[in-house]
Amino acid sequence: MSSDLKQTPLYQNYVDRGAKIVEFGGWAMPVQFSSIKEEHNAARYEIGLFDVSHMGEIEVTGKDASQFVQYLLSNDTDNLTTSKALYTALCNEEGGVIDDLVIYKLADDNYLLVVNAANTEKDFNWILKHKEKFDVEVQNVSNQYGQLAIQGPKARDLINQLVDEDVTEMKMFEFKQGVKLFAANVILSQSGYTGEDGFEIYCNIDDTEKIWDGLLEYNVMPCGLGARDTLRLEAGLPLHGQDLTESITPYEGGIAFASKPLIDADFIGKSVLKDQKENGAPRRTVGLELLEKGIARTGYEVMDLDGNIIGEVTSGTQSPSSGKSIALAMIKRDEFEMGRELLVQVRKRQLKAKIVKKNQIDK
């Protein structure tokens, strides 16, 4: 493995725990600690802990910070409060998704954008390029933050025992600042990438290992990127670089809820997104279940039963929860019909599949 890969503060901790390390977005990350299935099931049915410190953090501050983040982002950032975050997209002029991200309003003039690891530098440069007309400062503060995700149906009860705040009523994307966890000061966000209840914990980078080790003392399973991918795919959650790209809009990529082109404020890509909201996008993302043995991989062709190509697989795996072969695929809008049978070209075979809901959590 290349020695110039970036490492999170927990890299040596993974190695000491015997994790299998892989390259991901320029980072050396654990793909698994025990087995992907064990880790998947821990987060789906019990409780699992992920190191997501490779994610990027970009801070926007200054007098025009609120207007600037609205200009950059496709969702309505007027809905933000200092306790309510927002999932949104950074779009180009054609409405394509440069990145999907979560934005936190830390104060009236201070916003934290949490972006995908592989896109941090690209996003940062895009944001800098567009700040000219705004009185703002933009900083890449990724090297100041550690980030952990504790996920699963038992995560809330554990966190409630460990922090100095009541988290029992926290709803999706609500967050609290200044929470004490193992004597460290953290931002606690009710969010995640698994389709389960849970929290994302933002801490000073120097506190990351203390919190990680502290949580693992409570019979919590460490989980790697392999389980993170199968969990998010079962939940129908998109991965940027596969299900979302700079040539896929929020309406095509299944995140229409993150686009609000009817608001008064202008933002980059608004005219294209307004047209797609009103008239429909040319393509749409669907869930697939393969009806024959095989795995639908990214880029595999999707055809109608006559063999006409109508789209392609964007992500696919075997579901550890159900054992079924599941996928997300991008198809022409007019070809969509729930339950419809299609074909997927898996190597030299054409396998039958059917259109199902994107969220395929089976428990």
Swiss-Prot record:
* The name this protein goes by in its record: Aminomethyltransferase
Membership in a protein family:
Belongs to the GcvT family.
Show the disulfide pairing.
Answer: none
Q: How does it assemble?
A: The glycine cleavage system is composed of four proteins: P, T, L and H.
Please write the reaction equations for the catalytic activity of this protein: N(6)-[(R)-S(8)-aminomethyldihydrolipoyl]-L-lysyl-[protein] + (6S)-5,6,7,8-tetrahydrofolate = N(6)-[(R)-dihydrolipoyl]-L-lysyl-[protein] + (6R)-5,10-methylene-5,6,7,8-tetrahydrofolate + NH4(+)
What are its E.C. numbers? 2.1.2.10
Matching SUPFAM superfamilies: Aminomethyltransferase beta-barrel domain (SSF101790), Folate-binding domain (SSF103025)
- What does the UniProt keyword field contain? Aminotransferase, Transferase
State the Gene Ontology BP annotations: glycine decarboxylation via glycine cleavage system
Protein's UniProt keywords contain Transferase: yes
Give me the Gene Ontology terms describing cellular component: cytosol; glycine cleavage complex
- Which residues fall in a coiled-coil region? none
Q: Give GO terms: molecular function aspect only.
A: aminomethyltransferase activity; transaminase activity
Q: Which purpose does this protein serve, as stated in its record?
A: The glycine cleavage system catalyzes the degradation of glycine.
Q: Which InterPro entries match?
A: GCS_T, GCS_T_bac, GCST_C, GCV_T_N, GcvT/YgfZ/DmdA, GcvT/YgfZ_C, TrmE/GcvT_dom1
